[in-house]
Amino acid sequence: MATPANQREARNLNRVFAAATLCASLALGACGDLGRFQTASSPGFAPVKPNKPAAQTPATEREHSRILSSYGGSYDDPRLEALITKTVDRLVAASERPDLTYKVTILNSGAVNAFALPTGQLYVTRGLIALASDTSELSSVLAHEMAHVLAKHAAIREDQAKQAAVVTRVVADMGNDPDMNALALAKTKLTMASFSRAQEFEADGIGVGISARAKFDPFGASRFLTAMERTAALTANRAPADPRSLDFLSSHPATPERVQNAQANARQYSSPEAGERDRDAYLSAIDNLVYGEDPSEGFVRGRRFLHPKLGFTFQVPDGFVLENTAQAVVGVREGGTQAMRFDVVRVPAEQSLGDYLNSGWMENVDKASTEDVTINGFPSATATASGDQWQFRIYALRFGSDVYRFIFAAKKKTPESDRSFRETVNSFRRLTLAEIQAARPLRIKIVTVQPGDTIESLASRMQGVDRPVDRFRVLNGFDSRSTVKPRDRVKIVVD
């Protein structure tokens, strides 16, 4: 959760909690853009002639700053940066434009994501780096993003978006037949989705070819896609909805198809095991890498949220899944019948919290329900509100110079739901000095398998993660049939 900042308040209640539910259900696996990383060439799409990346402009500088702000800033690790630089140099030399220059920024985020700006600025999150098991897997991601730059996909997509916007305005101006208008708008959206998919397929073909010519194992792409799919499955199993069901306009094929296409594409260049994986060097480079959330921005441990920098903590009831985002901490209860949002706002010191709750930032607040309360010594106020599908309980709590909001929603308000909401708010307290000093990030630790070790025994050493055996398999690229043997090197997560 970001530190306090002025922000425009959401006025639509359903929109507020639709966003909260979406963020919580996606969690780690879908915060990484599964659709963006494809690895197969697609028949029927003519390749775009590679071009030089666009020059740096004030707009791209602003975009770079926005990306850093959204992803926790940059992550500095000289050893890891050296490995990435060496990898990119090999890829550039093997690309269609070896004269171009790329700069890679490691983002301080546990999300699994990678993307590129037209200028050749590439971004990878440390969450993606932690998930990859060798240099060839990372190279497949970097080559894919380089391909987007070479093919000038961002500029082409912008042109397509402008055309789609014109169509949308024309349809809206016609306005005579609602059914026809809806159909036309849907077709426009599907056309855009199909166009994005075409770009992804083109980047797949270019990227796998670059990796193969750089002598990396081109099958690293399919292995990494499999790891992403398994990560998403872990997330879906603990969240209230399957992330893939949340976007019906997604044009990307199911992950098994992506993996199959990646394998078919790689076979054009190499047989399995022929290219370089560079696993040992990669594991050495990521040893001690921060895993998951950065404590400086707050972090989730089970049902607790702790923010050592701001000095507070709270805990949600059993059955809630918490997710810390850049804007707020959001949570959803199993089954999706209850949701919550926790964030920070600026409220003038002279304005009472009760007046703030009734100031119009949320619609349909029952003013008669407003009451002043004290929570663990902190002045607070609470009220109820109602929407079409949700019933709300809201709190404002003054902590130092800032005001924190708890916004709870239930599809059906019951004494039990109201009690669980109150329990959450009443758990808000200051962290002790000892708790602040003990708040350390989780880290990737590389260990050597000893005689007698098993996947289960190694996974039992994992700390701070759910489903440790499954998480261990995903982190190390293992499936249900995999085993370990002495002297193997594997990743575990430790505190």
Regions found by a protein language model. Name each.
Residues A2-P4, N12-A18, L28-F314, V321, ...:
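A Zn2+-metalloprotease active-site environment signal
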Residues R341, L357-R405:
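Signature of long, low-cysteine stretches enriched in small and polar/charged residues
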Residues T313, G319-V321, T454, R489:
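Residue-level marker of beta-strand positions
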Residues S139, L322, F406-R443:
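Surface-exposed amphipathic alpha-helical segments
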Residues L433-D466, D488:
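Primarily a LysM-type cell-wall glycan-binding module
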Residues V104, V112, L122-Y123, R244, ...:
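Surface-exposed aromatic
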Residues P468-D495:
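Extracellular LysM carbohydrate-binding repeats and other cell-envelope/extracellular binding modules
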